[in-house]
Structure formats: C-alpha cells, structure tokens
Amino acid sequence: MNQGLLHSKILSFASHIPDNFVSIDEFAAVGDLPGKLDLHRLTGIEGHRKSDAEEGSLELAIKAAEKSMTRADIKPEEIDLVINCAVSNLSGKLGLHISPSMATIIAKELGIEEAICFDISN
C-alpha cells in the first residue's frame, strides 16, 4: 500500500462562470414563449450567464483550475490528481469533445505533467 495515499487531501477547488449576464426576459425573448409570461416571478430566476463563442466548458474549467491553484498557492508539479466535474464537454476551440478526458486537457494547459486525470459527468 502506498503510504502517501494516507495523507492525500483536497487543498482547493473552484468554479468559474462567464461574465456576460443575460436577463431572464432577454433569454425568454429568443424562445417561443408568450410575451406576457413573467418568468422571473414564476421561477425566481433573474438571469443566466452566457459564455462567448470561444469559451466553452473546457475554457471555463481551465479558468477555475487556475483560481484553485492560486487559492492553494500550489505549483503544477505539486498536483497529483485532476478531476473535472462537468455536465457538458464543450470547448470553444474543439466544439463537442469526447476523448481524451477534459481533465487531461486541463492538466496539459496548466503544465501539470505527473497527475492522474479523469472526468466525472452525468
């Protein structure tokens, strides 16, 4: 048994959402919904975040990983495990992405070379 595993811990995690805010009224205007439907009152949702065309879940995940590394004050060579948890595998650069795992691409982008990488998705 690897004794190092007994001392493993999560030092940090993070998320990143796009800066662009779209109100629920703007969002609903694109769809085929009745104009008098008050979605904010019905749902309590004020709006959604919208990424740019070049910014998919991969790019958002890379930004989140950078935040996490900064918070923990950790260098790429100190990271042993990269887990990407996402509902979608979309990349502004790649479009729909299936293989290799997004965690592998995130690790490569951040200079993490000696880590186990895997995705968790629905």
Give the location of each predicted region:
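Fold-independent oxyanion-binding glycine-rich loops
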Residues: 13, 86, 110
